């Protein structure tokens, strides 16, 4: 029966409300009680009064084991964090006049990234007068997207940004794996 909560949860004597709508440890409604009556009832069964809905009128409190409640809350948060996936964006840089072997090497690397479910940004930097032949870069990016279509979808079509043209590929994720 601790009365000190390290987070913002109000328990036992730390509850500021004078009256509470009380829920018993087995889930039954005990009605509106004063804070002191609620604490007295909780002490009889060796449990804590925990404020679960502070903004309700009157605030809702439940009789429960605070330590167990806190443990369950942490477990739920841990599960939620485990299910989250951080999406990383990997960049592959090409040139508008890339040779076939270099293209295939970059393609192989991009496919590895897509298999790991990372997004891939494919960019082409135009140097000097090459900017006048944007269609070369466009063709290279379209060929790259075509080669990856079994693993990825085009999230953003080839687009110019200053002296660079880029394409964004997102992995195709199977819903069955999750």
Curated annotation (Swiss-Prot):
One Pfam family per UniProt: IF3_C
Gene Ontology process terms (BP): ribosome disassembly
Principal location: cytoplasm
PANTHER family: TRANSLATION INITIATION FACTOR IF-3, TRANSLATION INITIATION FACTOR IF-3, MITOCHONDRIAL
Xref: InterPro entries: T_IF-3_C_sf, T_IF-3_N_sf, Translation_initiation_fac3_CS, Translation_initiation_fac_3, Translation_initiation_fac_3_C, Translation_initiation_fac_3_N
Quaternary data: Monomer.
One Gene Ontology term, aspect cellular component: membrane
Keywords of this entry: Cytoplasm, Initiation factor, Protein biosynthesis
GO molecular function, one term: translation initiation factor activity
NCBIfam families for this protein: infC
Cell compartments where the protein resides: Cytoplasm
Family named by the database record: Belongs to the IF-3 family.
Protein name: Translation initiation factor IF-3
Keyword Protein biosynthesis belongs to the record: yes
Gene designation: infC
Stated role: IF-3 binds to the 30S ribosomal subunit and shifts the equilibrium between 70S ribosomes and their 50S and 30S subunits in favor of the free subunits, thus enhancing the availability of 30S subunits on which protein synthesis initiation begins.
């Amino acid at each position: 029966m601790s009365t000190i909560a390290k987070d913002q949860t109000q328990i036992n004597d730390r509850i500021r409300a004078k009256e509470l709508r009380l829920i018993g440890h087995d889930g039954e409604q005990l009605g509106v009680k004063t804070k002191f009556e609620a604490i007295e009832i909780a002490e009889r069964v060796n449990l804590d009064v925990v404020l679960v809905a502070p903004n309700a009128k009157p605030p809702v409190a439940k009789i429960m084991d605070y330590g167990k409640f806190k443990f369950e809350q942490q477990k739920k948060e841990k599960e939620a964090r485990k299910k989250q996936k951080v999406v990383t964006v990997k960049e592959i840089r090409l040139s508008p006049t890339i040779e076939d072997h270099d293209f295939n090497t970059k393609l192989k690397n991009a496919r590895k990234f897509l298999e790991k479910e990372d997004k891939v940004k494919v960019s082409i930097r135009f140097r000097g007068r090459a900017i006048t032949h944007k269609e070369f870069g466009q063709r290279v990016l379209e060929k790259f997207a075509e080669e990856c279509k079994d693993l990825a979808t085009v999230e953003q079509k080839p687009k110019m940004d200053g002296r660079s043209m880029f394409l964004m590929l997102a992995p195709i994720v199977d819903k069955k794996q999750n």
